Amino acid sequence: MHPGGRYLQYADGRPFFYLGDTAWELFHRTTREEARLYLEDRARKGFTVIQAVCLAERDGLRVPNAYGDLPFADAGFTRPNERYFAYVDEVVATADSLGLVIGLLPAWGDKFCLKWGPGPEIFTTGGRAEAFGRYLGERYRTRRNIIWILGGDRPPEGRELILRAFARGIACGVAGREDYSACLITYHPWGKSSSGDWLHDEPWLAFNMQQNGHAYDFDLWERIARDYARRPVKPVLDGEPIYEEHPIDFDREKYGTSEALHVRRAFYHEVFSGACGHTYGCHAVWQMWEPGRYAPVTGPVRSWRESLSLPGAYQVCYGRELIESRPFFRRIPDQGVIAGDAGWGHGRCTATRDSLGTYAMVYSESGRPFAVDLGRVSGKRIVAWWYDVRSGRPLRIGEFRRRDAGATMTFTPPTCGKGNDWVLVLDDARMKYPPPGRCPEARSGAAG
């Protein structure tokens, strides 16, 4: 945790941008060859976290993994099966070798709060939850590539004692005592909510996680801003935004299927509103769906292998590159960068900047023109760029003197309309920042 309380960092102090991918069924449905193929792809693209579940959503207590192993060796679900967890070990180790962190859910939410799904609800007492948490904590105590995620698409209300027991068990397993500084723990809630709605003051909750519920017409920035304003200060991110190629609001006939624009929209509005990172998801990938092998859940469009190269998977990585190309820990949300109307809905513009004013960024979802308060950027001379969020390419607008531009300046993105979203980057020329993003000579698989 960075001392400022807004961002995550590596143990050596380097910035850690949480760029997650959703692979809930990774341990449950893949072979080791498939897991390696998937993890190598995500590492190559630039993801930093893979979210996966030990006791999986898709009937993970009664349907065995790809090698025929169930997670428990007894019908009472009390004795972990070493063969099952040895495979989890192997996948976690493979991820570590590729520089990936595993966002590890001990169990999907139906295992402690049924509401829907196959269950069964096996964690009905604090003792059982603490014992399983301790088992996993001890098993992975030497691993440095794990972030713990409790929950799993359920509200925590009424289950607070169970969650405290899970967290206590994990901490005691990792550190030998109830020391929450030894392990990062968060909570994955159900749709259109945040862990902060219930759990913000829990000592075990290191940062807040949200889920938007796979809707499109959703004011993403407001919920991030709400968690950003909570005290004590804790980082926040969306751990389940709308998945790429997911039925929008679970109603394909009425709203269609999500695409790369929906992915980008969630990323930029939320990160620019103060999120410490973001999670991407693809509808086929989270369930590791292959035709003829598993029953599909709400109609994936193509297999998980084909889905690895969807445009949104590249484009969130371009977003990470943009954020990391400027001073990381000083970044703050600031709608004051936008002079006048910031817009609403799909015409929204969202701004972020350096707290010292050496750079500012504005995301225009529909490519509409907007005015900038130049007083929010330091320096007598300012360098301006457009960042193409579809390709990760920067386009230099030019350099100008502040006194010639006046107090405000209007910028018109190169294109406009649905799917023509852009980021404006303004730099204090004295800083000599490089072009925004990673600036490769060419990109592939990114258009869309």
Map each language-model feature to its residues.
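Short strand-edge motifs at loop-to-beta-strand transitions and within beta-strands
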Residues: 407-409
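Extracellular glycoside hydrolase catalytic/binding regions
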Residues: 131, 145, 151-288, 293-308
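Short hydrophobic alpha-helix segments
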Residues: 19, 398-400
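Structured helix-beta-strand junction loops
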Residues: 45-46, 98, 142-143, 204, ...
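Active-site mouth of glycoside hydrolases
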Residues: 3-219
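A short, compositionally biased
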Residues: 1-5, 379-381
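Aromatic- and carboxylate-lined catalytic core of secreted/periplasmic carbohydrate-active enzymes
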Residues: 14, 244-246, 259-398, 413-445
